[in-house]
Curated annotation (Swiss-Prot):
InterPro entries: Crypto/Photolyase_FAD-like_sf, Crypto/Photolyase_N_sf, Cryptochr/Photolyase_FAD-bd, Cryptochrome/DNA_photolyase_1, DNA_photolyase_1_CS_C, DNA_photolyase_N, Photolyase_8HDF, Rossmann-like_a/b/a_fold. Residues 3-132 form the Photolyase/cryptochrome alpha/beta domain. This is Deoxyribodipyrimidine photo-lyase. It comes from Synechococcus sp. (strain ATCC 27144 / PCC 6301 / SAUG 1402/1). Its EC number is 4.1.99.3. Binds 1 FAD per subunit. Binds 1 coenzyme F420 non-covalently per subunit. Involved in repair of UV radiation-induced DNA damage. Catalyzes the light-dependent monomerization (300-600 nm) of cyclobutyl pyrimidine dimers (in cis-syn configuration), which are formed between adjacent bases on the same DNA strand upon exposure to ultraviolet radiation. The gene is phr. PANTHER family: CRYPTOCHROME (PTHR11455), CRYPTOCHROME CIRCADIAN CLOCK 5 ISOFORM X1 (PTHR11455:SF9). SUPFAM superfamilies: Cryptochrome/photolyase FAD-binding domain, Cryptochrome/photolyase, N-terminal domain.
């Protein structure tokens, strides 16, 4: 029997449109999947129960998909730097394929695994899959990575987009002798969520697995994508795709998503619909902008992109941070969003911007505390997107506007005018008139235990601006012009 090829799954929990997997299948029919439950990730302080639950659901379906194709998914638990080379050696594998990671830990881990495989005389083949364009494809004319989205988008959107690759079929499983040889290294079955040390019953924006992700993409592109632009900022409406967890874990291929949107664009009969589809495609470009940024500037994972913000005098008042995490700020739109996050593991993007601005510029708390809290709860928690979003809100990252400050009441009035979203997540305030919910000016009797505002927005934004201007003057570092 020919030497098998192993494919190591990480953020690509599917068989369809998987570049590394398709390349491995082109080399051999005896293609065996593997996934390693890495304690470095699962036991991280940033791990969210919702994310582990989604991962487990994806792995369950991936096991079934491999069986249907004639092969299997091997499960390991422990340090992949040791287990994967050991498994490959036991099987006398010809090669181990995987798709590249952009995160600092993943890149270091992959380098260690590749080095160990090379020492053992086994090929390590790494390909790009989670991006439409790899980080070295989208560079400025001088060969540097972009730090501003506009020029990045202009270059990115002009590049021809790759098409989905074929789904591997007619695979060959390991022999009984091979399975016996590696049995001591393997998990006999996928651990339950409880066995992994987590509990989750908050559901998901889209059910785990490739089948549900493909169905949701098709449903979205058949209908809602045509109204995406006018609907996407209203949290009470189902105006977004809900595909962020599937894209995070690779339950769906990015090329599949682009092709489906492009097909909808070609079939659209109005300029408004075509514009909406283009806006959704721009969100895919934002995703790649942040991933490219983290790849080129891995220090973003630990701190601000702009050095001025290293010295910003965050107040970091613990009582205010606790109130924010517990949806007790007294600002209904903020508290509704925070409750949605903690109960469902997901938050509407408009609300994300509101609560992030509130934490950093009303409460004057270091954005990194908000970033970590989100990662501890988000089902779609992605280091690059989460970090990029928080640095955007704090004005410490790329494309900064330091004095961009969201007024919670103005945001609620514009995007939740009937307070439908607020009442959905704060049912204890359903008796309050929408006008008062939006403004936050609720009478003491009407509050019925709901807190009064913990800070005065107008006063705090003045204090934040003063702190920023004082620091800027002291350091005299060029920054982007603030909003007028």
């Amino acid at each position: 029997m020919a030497a098998p090829i192993l494919f190591w799954h990480r953020r690509d929990l599917r068989l369809s449109d998987n570049i590394g997997l398709a390349a491995a299948r082109a080399q051999s029919a005896q293609l065996i999947g593997l996934f390693c439950l890495d304690p470095q990730i699962l036991q991280s302080a940033d791990m969210a129960p919702a994310r582990v639950a989604y991962l487990q659901g994806c792995l369950q379906e991936l096991q079934q998909r491999y069986q249907q194709a004639g092969s299997r998914l091997l499960l390991l638990q422990g340090d992949p730097q040791h287990l994967i080379p050991q498994l490959a050696q036991q099987l006398q594998a010809e090669a181990v394929y995987w798709n590249q990671d952009i995160e600092p830990y993943g890149r270091d881990r992959d380098g260690q695994v590749a080095a160990a495989l090379k020492t053992a005389g086994i090929r390590a083949v790494q390909l790009w899959d989670q991006l439409l364009h790899s980080p070295d494809q989208i560079l400025s004319g001088s060969g540097n990575p972009y730090s501003v989205y506009g020029p990045f988008w202009k270059n990115w959107q002009a590049q021809p987009k790759p098409t989905p690759v074929a789904t591997p079929t007619e695979l060959v499983d390991l022999s009984p002798e091979q399975l016996t040889a590696i049995a001591p290294l393997l998990l006999s079955e996928l651990p339950t969520l409880k066995q992994l040390g987590f509990d989750w019953d908050g559901g998901f924006p889209v059910e785990p697995g490739e089948t549900a992700a493909i169905a949701r993409l098709q449903e979205f592109c058949d209908r809602a994508i045509a109204d995406y632009d006018p609907q996407r900022n209203f949290p009470a409406e189902a105006g977004t795709s809900g595909l962020s967890p599937a894209l995070k874990f690779g339950a769906i291929g990015i090329r599949q998503a682009w092709r489906a949107a492009s097909a909808a664009h070609a079939l659209s009969r109005s300029d408004e619909a075509r514009n909406s589809i283009r806006v959704w495609q721009q969100e895919l470009a934002w995703r790649e902008f942040y991933q490219h940024a983290l790849y080129h500037f891995p220090s973003l994972a630990d701190g601000p992109y702009r050095s001025l913000w290293q010295q910003f005098p965050w107040e970091n008042r613990e009582a205010l941070f606790t109130a924010w995490t517990q949806a007790q700020t007294g600002y209904p739109i903020v508290d509704a969003a925070m409750r949605q996050l903690t109960e469902t593991g997901w938050m509407h993007n408009r609300c994300w911007m509101i609560v992030a601005s509130f934490l950093t510029k009303d409460l004057i708390i270091d954005w990194r505390r908000g970033e970590q809290f989100f990662m501890q709860h988000l089902v779609d928690g992605d280091l690059a997107a989460n970090n990029g979003g928080w640095q955007w809100s704090a004005s410490s990252g790329m494309d900064p506007k330091p004095l961009r400050i969201f007024n919670p009441a103005s945001q609620a009035k514009k995007f939740d005018a009937t307070a439908t979203y607020i009442k959905r997540w704060l049912p204890e305030l359903r008796h309050v008139h929408p006008k008062d919910l939006i403004s936050g000016e609720i009478t003491p009797i009407g509050r019925r235990g709901y807190p009064a505002p913990i800070v005065n927005h107008n006063l705090r934004q003045k204090q934040f601006k003063a702190l920023y201007n004082q620091l800027k003057a002291a350091i005299a570092e060029p920054e982007a012009e603030p909003d007028s």
